[in-house]
Amino acid sequence: MKKVQLITDGACLGNPGPGGWSAILRFEEQKKELWGCEKQTTNNRMELTAAIEGLRALREKCQVEVVTDSEYVLKGITTWIDGWKRKGWMTAAKKPVINQDLWKLLDEQVNRHQATWTWTKGHASHADNNRCDELATRAAREQSKS
């Protein structure tokens, strides 16, 4: 099974507002950059979309280390999601899970792979995370012009 590193980031101008996401896939010496945007969204939705699209780009089952600077995504996928599913996608406060559509898509993609999750400090020393931030911000800016 291939070992892949997936680095993700999301950006939003306004929150809500125009947003962008990006993902970098690393396999051995290969590197692939992905990015996209939405006209009206939130930062959390873009963080989730980055992880979904990065995982979706993998055509076969892989061992994936997902690197994110989003504590929301990290805690959601590693800590909260099992409880949400048990409770019919309701939070501990008995309210519907925000961004449920994307959490379901992320769960679907994660289950295709052997995934581990790593948090990295944003805007710091992780070169690929900084590149993801640059791509996501650029995508959000381009979306805001259209």
Swiss-Prot record:
- Assembly mode: Monomer.
**Recorded family membership:** Belongs to the RNase H family.
InterPro entries membership: RNase_H, RNaseH-like_sf, RNaseH_domain, RNaseH_sf, RNaseHI
Provide the binding site for Mg(2+) 2.
Answer: D9, D133
- Write down how the cofactor binds this protein: Binds 1 Mg(2+) ion per subunit. May bind a second metal ion at a regulatory site, or after substrate binding.
Compartment list: Cytoplasm
Q: Which residues form the RNase H type-1 domain?
A: 1-141
PROSITE patterns linked: RNASE_H_1 (PS50879)
Q: Kindly list the positions annotated as binding Mg(2+) 1.
A: D9, E47, D69
For this record, the Gene Ontology CC terms, alphabetical, are:
cytoplasm
Record's NCBIfam families?
PRK00203.1
Q: Which UniProt keywords apply?
A: Cytoplasm, Endonuclease, Hydrolase, Magnesium, Metal-binding, Nuclease
Q: What class of enzyme is it?
A: hydrolase
Instruction: Please name the GO terms that the record assigns under molecular function.
Output: magnesium ion binding; nucleic acid binding; RNA-DNA hybrid ribonuclease activity
* Protein name per UniProt: Ribonuclease H
| Cofactor names | Mg(2+)
Q: Which domain of life is it from?
A: Bacteria
Give me the reactions it catalyses.
Endonucleolytic cleavage to 5'-phosphomonoester
Instruction: Cite the EC number.
Output: 3.1.26.4
Which CDD domains does UniProt cross-reference here?
Answer: RNase_HI_prokaryote_like
Enumerate the Gene Ontology biological process terms. Answer: DNA replication, removal of RNA primer
Name a Pfam family for this protein: RNase_H
Task: Name the PANTHER family for this protein.
Answer: RIBONUCLEASE H1 (PTHR10642:SF26)
Which purpose does this protein serve, as stated in its record? Endonuclease that specifically degrades the RNA of RNA-DNA hybrids.
Q: Which organism is it from?
A: Solibacter usitatus (strain Ellin6076)
